[in-house]
Amino acid sequence: MSTSAKTQSAPDQFFSASLAEADPEIAAAIAGELGRQRHEIELIASENIVSRAVLEAQGSVMTNKYAEGYPGHRYYGGCEFVDVAENLAIDRAKKLFGAGFANVQPNSGSQMNQAVFLALLQPGDTFMGLDLAAGGHLTHGATVNMSGKWFKPVHYTVRREDGIIDMDEVAKIAEANKPKLIIAGGSAYSRAWDFKRFREIADSVGAYFMVDMAHFAGLVAGGVHASPVPHAHVCTTTTHKSLRGPRGGLILCNDEALAKKFNSAIFPGLQGGPLMHVIAAKAVAFKEALQPDFKVYAKNVVENAKALAETLRGHGFDIVSGGTDNHLMLVDLRPKALKGNVSEKALVRAGITCNKNGIPFDPEKPFVTSGIRLGTPAATTRGFGVAEFQQVGGMIAEVLNAIAQSSDGQAPLVEAAIRQRVKELTDRFPIYS
């Protein structure tokens, strides 16, 4: 072979070799993950299943492009096509949520929330959020998080008797601490939020009002959850979870001056070049969420969550707050003398994926917990309805009741039988076939 032919073969192979040819180890891991998603029931509330179109956009050549700045104002040339993608994402996000301004560049939920803090707070400023132990989020002032280290968080919580936020108590805490920012939203709160009352409380103490709707944004987009956009100074959301897009963040507001602050906080404040392949995928997901069938999906997510919660209650399980108004629920396992970590592992062995989760006023450590969190978006996306979620609730009850009677937190025969039933159920609702 000539020297010329040899020098040409390397780039030819670089551009033509499949993943399986170039890196069989990673290809095998991806194939394994696809198999897991196909044959397990996904009940982690923060997870979903994206469309093939979203996957295609995220795996596109836009991953090659650097585009520091914003559309029309980049620090690099050659941005005409990524500008098209970002402008489409911005316009679709604004239309989807009825907002005047949108920043689609945050790489994650944590970074979108950090950007709001950077724009509105100074180090040491006081802000309020829902306590992590009551269903809040790390970025809302947990001591281990930047938000809890750089700022002064004060937290509201839920009532012991019913697991619901006491708005009168929120008002008292705000009046006593005069926070500069009040946050509504969390990662494990299953009830509706009173955005109007939160804004009134924020106004009464001169605070900004922020809603982190990362978990329920898809329900807002689908019209089955009240929108915080008319009430909040700023709304943040991840673009995955119930919104069913790629992993990333989004900032929404209706005030141009604030929008400029948030833009500056993202770039150059926190990030450099945005992930243009992810922004393209966000645009695709927002277009999907603007279609009529997304409203059907959102309605089904809530109906399925209520069905799952009621089924578990019927099997003697305690649901924190007594039920759910959205896509998720917390199961209090203490009446069954079970721990969250043991229950999570048993359900995974049975083909049902969920996560251990602290419950309000949980006496257990975070890696043990007294509860599990369940959510319905992913299984709803693959086609499960109320009947299927009633079956799933029964399967969960069988596994948990079996391990409650065992000495080592395992019930191999029951787990194996349920795993076979899970496979039969998931085979009826294939993904990426």
From Swiss-Prot:
Pathway(s) where this gene product acts: One-carbon metabolism; tetrahydrofolate interconversion; Amino-acid biosynthesis; glycine biosynthesis; glycine from L-serine: step 1/1
InterPro entries in the cross-refs: PyrdxlP-dep_Trfase, PyrdxlP-dep_Trfase_major, PyrdxlP-dep_Trfase_small, Ser_HO-MeTrfase, Ser_HO-MeTrfase-like, Ser_HO-MeTrfase_PLP_BS, SHMT-like_dom
List of residues that carry N6-(pyridoxal phosphate)lysine: K241
Catalytic activity: (6R)-5,10-methylene-5,6,7,8-tetrahydrofolate + glycine + H2O = (6S)-5,6,7,8-tetrahydrofolate + L-serine
Keywords: Amino-acid biosynthesis, Cytoplasm, One-carbon metabolism, Pyridoxal phosphate, Transferase
Pfam entry (one): SHMT
One Gene Ontology CC term in the entry: cytosol
Enzyme Commission no: 2.1.2.1
Record-marked site positions (Plays an important role in substrate specificity): H240
Any single biological process term in GO: glycine biosynthetic process from serine
Locations listed in the record: Cytoplasm
Superkingdom, natural source: Bacteria
Binding positions ((6S)-5,6,7,8-tetrahydrofolate): L132, G136, H137, L138
Cofactor: pyridoxal 5'-phosphate
Gene Ontology MF term list: glycine hydroxymethyltransferase activity; pyridoxal phosphate binding
Stated family: Belongs to the SHMT family.
Subunit structure: Homodimer.
Job description of the protein: Catalyzes the reversible interconversion of serine and glycine with tetrahydrofolate (THF) serving as the one-carbon carrier. This reaction serves as the major source of one-carbon groups required for the biosynthesis of purines, thymidylate, methionine, and other important biomolecules. Also exhibits THF-independent aldolase activity toward beta-hydroxyamino acids, producing glycine and aldehydes, via a retro-aldol mechanism.
Name of the molecule in the record: Serine hydroxymethyltransferase
